[in-house]
Each structure stands twice: as C-alpha cells, then as structure tokens.
Amino acid sequence: MNSFLFSLACSLLVAIPAISAQDEDAGGAGDETSEGEDTTGSDETPSTGGGGDGGNEETITAGNEDCWSKRPGWKLPDNLLTKTEFTSVDECRKMCEESAVEPSCYILQINTETNECYRNNEGDVTWSSLQYDQPNVVQWHLHACSK
C-alpha cells in the first residue's frame, strides 16, 4: 500500500506542472499577474528558486515584457527580510535586478503605508512562514524570464 501511495504522489508531482504549463501555453491567466492584481486569490506556495539563478529555473515569458509578478497581501516575517534604502517600487525592483550581493535578490516586500522596501535575506525563503491576506503589504517576485 505504501508503494502505491508513493507512486501516486510521484505521478502527481509530474502531472501537475505539466497541466499548469498547458494552461499557460493555452493563454490561461495563471495565478500571478504582472503589474495587476492576483486574479484567483491563490494560496499556493511559490517556487523557492531564486530569480538570480536562471540556470535552476524554468524560463518564463512575461506577458507584459516584465519579469516581475505581484502578490498583494503576501507577507514574510521580518526576520526573513532585509530593509533597503528605497521607497519606490521601481527603485526597489531596479536594485534587486542589478544586485550582485549574495543571496540573490528575488523577493521584494513593500509596506504600502510607509513605502518601505524589504528584500529576501536568505537564498531559500521559508515559505511555511508566509502569511496571506495581510493588509498594507505587497510582495513582488522576480522570475528568470525572457522578454
């Protein structure tokens, strides 16, 4: 019985990404949006691959020539983030894209009341700490993508 459950779980790990890829190829909206709102209210955990390590990530073609996706209401605890000096989303995104500092910058979290910008301080984010539906916070995720 255990080997059957293991086989079933492995099959799902292969089938689910393939189905998601078919949805994207067919013009499906997906869960993440660029510059727009999250259209599904999704609570799925994002991939832990860093945006700065393109060799370990699938290439994503962004629909609006942008390599960022927006997650309103997503919040990581302060101990997983480092505050930056930037106060605008554009400046913060540019800093992240051009950063050569380790770990690679691929998660930005913006406090929309204070306009404070935070970035991931670890290479692998602890997604189990992620909180959803939090007020006054927006996360931006940088993807390895082609324009």
From Swiss-Prot:
CDD domains noted in UniProt: PAN_APPLE
PTM comment text: The N-terminus is blocked.
GO cellular component terms, semicolon-separated: extracellular region
One MF term in the entry's GO annotations: toxin activity
Compartment(s) where it occurs, according to its Swiss-Prot or TrEMBL record: Secreted
Superkingdom of origin organism: Eukaryota
Disulfide bonds: 67-145, 92-117, 96-105
Residue ranges of the region described as Disordered: 21-71
Cleavable signal peptide: 1-21
Gene3D superfamilies: Hepatocyte Growth Factor (3.50.4.10)
SUPFAM superfamilies: Hairpin loop containing domain-like
Keyword Cell division: no
UniProt KW DNA-binding keyword: no
Primary location: secreted
Tissue specificity annotation: Expressed by salivary glands.
Keywords: Disulfide bond, Hemostasis impairing toxin, Platelet aggregation inhibiting toxin, Secreted, Signal, Toxin
Acidic residues composition-biased segments: 22-41
Function (record text): Inhibits collagen-stimulated platelet aggregation (IC(50)=60 nM), dense granule release and serotonin release. Does not inhibit platelet aggregation induced by ADP, arachidonic acid, and thrombin.
Protein name: Leech anti-platelet protein
Record organism: Haementeria officinalis
